């Protein structure tokens, strides 16, 4: 069996990793061994943070909805409960958008929730 020299393959593999590590500080962008570890760690962070992004946005929407609901004399949980009872199907993302950009529409929804709660 002939001997395989790794010149082309190794160069391609190294180049692929070093390209991904472009912009990293110091040895992390220049030395293959260090760059490979940095790229693997970056991929782990990216995977984890794609999951966290969903949680963080939901938390942000809830904070915004709560702030707007309190301007109308409701807490977040009572607003959501009232909207459910009034069978208003609107998700938190769009509710937060209304709370920030269309206060009049949000006010109408808050009134609907109050009526459904009997208040």
UniProtKB/Swiss-Prot annotation:
The molecular function terms in GO held by this entry are: rRNA binding; structural constituent of ribosome
GO CC: one term?
ribonucleoprotein complex
Q: What UniProt keywords are attached to this protein's entry?
A: Ribonucleoprotein, Ribosomal protein, RNA-binding, rRNA-binding
> Which Pfam family is one of those matched by this entry?
Ribosomal_L20
Name its GO BP terms in alphabetical order. Answer: ribosomal large subunit assembly; translation
| Keyword field contains Disulfide bond | no
Q: Does the keyword RNA-binding apply?
A: yes
PANTHER family of this UniProt entry? Answer: 39S RIBOSOMAL PROTEIN L20 (PTHR10986)
Extract the HAMAP family matched here.
Ribosomal_bL20
What does this chain do? Binds directly to 23S ribosomal RNA and is necessary for the in vitro assembly process of the 50S ribosomal subunit. It is not involved in the protein synthesizing functions of that subunit.
Annotated family: Belongs to the bacterial ribosomal protein bL20 family.
Q: Give the protein name, as stated in the record.
A: Large ribosomal subunit protein bL20
- Tell me what organism the protein belongs to: Coxiella burnetii (strain Dugway 5J108-111)
């Amino acid at each position: 069996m002939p001997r395989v020299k790794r010149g082309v393959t190794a160069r391609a593999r190294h180049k692929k990793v070093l390209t991904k590590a472009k912009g990293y500080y110091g040895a992390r962008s220049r030395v293959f061994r260090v760059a490979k570890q940095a790229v693997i760690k970056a991929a782990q962070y990216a995977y984890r943070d794609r999951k966290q992004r969903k949680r963080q946005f939901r938390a942000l929407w809830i904070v915004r909805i709560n702030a707007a609901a309190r301007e109308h004399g409701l807490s977040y949980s009572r607003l959501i409960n009232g909207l459910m009872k009034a069978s208003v199907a609107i998700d938190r993302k769009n509710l937060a958008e209304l709370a920030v950009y269309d206060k009049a529409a949000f006010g109408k929804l808050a009134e609907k929730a109050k009526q459904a709660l009997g208040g």
